[in-house]
A protein has these predicted regions:
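Iron-sulfur-associated redox domains of electron-transfer enzymes in respiratory
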Residues: 1-186
């Protein structure tokens, strides 16, 4: 959502924005290489992923959590009663924190460590005021930050419009999941 908002409302920031793709982008790319005959489906809380998927030939479909929940309800499936599968590759604690505001900045902090001065700033929810602040960065960079993480939804992606639980509960669940995860290997 941030990339779309920037392109539409803050194009003067484009040269300062990372060209790195989203996790959806990279996972879909890997899946299409490994399993080209399969369809890829992104499932998450973000409506903006639909437009991102239109630009990414590796993503075939996007479902928001509300849609998936409706399908489960219609089929009388309660995911909480199902046995969890083990993933072939476990995600890092830093990667699992991405959907929470501050998660991306925290992952960068972990990797940078003490190798460089790192001063992150969080934009937690894209509002008129935060857009004005970001526009000012074009002419005067913030002295107290050298990296800005922007989350369009307050609280992060966990609070996207397609979420089926309150953001605070989702954040607690993600943080508990993170506790079971290993750190990234740098």
């Amino acid at each position: 959502a941030w990339m779309q908002a920037m392109e539409k409302h803050l194009p003067e920031l484009k040269e300062y924005v990372s060209t790195s793709g989203s996790p959806m982008y990279y996972i879909a790319e890997v899946m299409k290489k490994e399993f080209p005959e399969y369809k890829t489906v992104f499932v998450g809380p973000c409506m903006a992923k639909r437009l991102e998927a239109e630009r990414n030939p590796n993503v075939d479909y996007v479902l928001i959590f509300e849609e998936l929940q409706a399908a489960f309800d219609a089929a009388q499936i309660n995911p909480a009663t199902l046995e969890a599968d083990k993933f072939a590759v476990e995600s890092s604690a830093q990667g699992r924190r991405f959907p929470i505001s501050g998660g991306v900045a925290g992952a960068v902090q972990f990797v940078v460590g003490d190798k460089a001065e790192y001063k992150p700033m969080k934009i937690d929810g894209l509002t008129k005021d935060s857009c004005k602040l970001l526009k000012r960065f074009v002419t005067k960079a913030p002295e107290d930050a050298n990296m800005v993480e922007v989350m369009c939804c307050e609280g992060g992606c966990i609070a996207g419009p397609g979420a089926v639980i309150p953001a605070k509960r989702g954040t607690v669940l993600v943080e508990n999941y993170v506790k079971t995860s290993k750190d990234i290997e740098c």
